[in-house]
């Protein structure tokens, strides 16, 4: 089998309502933007992967540089092709969707979902509903009640108020109302806060992170996510030593060397690599093994796009150290209907657990006509896409 073509397209899928991400510095998203890559072969099998699309950088990088590196190559030799994919970071944003497409192709050729090719571990994984917006306490209480009614066992809340005590009051009230009926995780989204950076919420230092972590311990929170900048290894390790609450992060760390450092320095009890933002899916499988060797959990981050979620689900289902799966859920903008718009089959949830699809490859099939209906024509004069 040989690769005969590599095609990248920018795709916009409209959302049912505007989405205001906590991590987006006041941005409004009216659609899900994806770079979708298709890798075709001489045997008629096509692999599909997807990554971010802030502009045309990924499309151009794949259709020019990476395409030339992959043509006429054996798609099963992914480790041999991986250096070219990794080096593409110099020419584009996130090239990891290309490795995902290769594994999708291999799984289809073998007639097996990718997680089974790697030995397989889980057919179902408990989900936690992951919030993505800020809202009033009343709306968040209704959100949690909605999750409980659906059988979802856990919710991740965001801390983005300039005064962390205000966020803590919200978390205290939700804990008071729901008690042990729901598990709570908390995401501070501080990993991108580098020296001199500014955003819509304040940057934490170690004393602030320590104060918040100790307050969350009293509320029986499962973990505190990204309380400090991602490369502040000393600060993260110092925080982890001083508190009992597990510290989580790693969604945009990249390279086995960084994940080895995260595992060895003990700054994170839970590592959260992402097949869209961090690394290729099999490289993250190696990172998860590093985490396992250091008695840590590896729970992929999945807030990106629906194809990215399905890719991370295949990774998670292959891991013995992945007790939870992140389910992005912020209705009305981001609800489960989006998966039925993009895929022939939507996500299957059963008693608070996501069912891992057994369809060959990455477990999904795009709806007929989806690409044609949502493809954005390439305008060389327009770099950003809104």
Q: Where do the language-model regions lie?
A:
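Metal- or metallocofactor-binding catalytic centers and their adjacent structured scaffolds
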Residues: 7, 40-109
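Conserved, mostly hydrophobic/aromatic
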Residues: 3, 44, 98, 111, ...
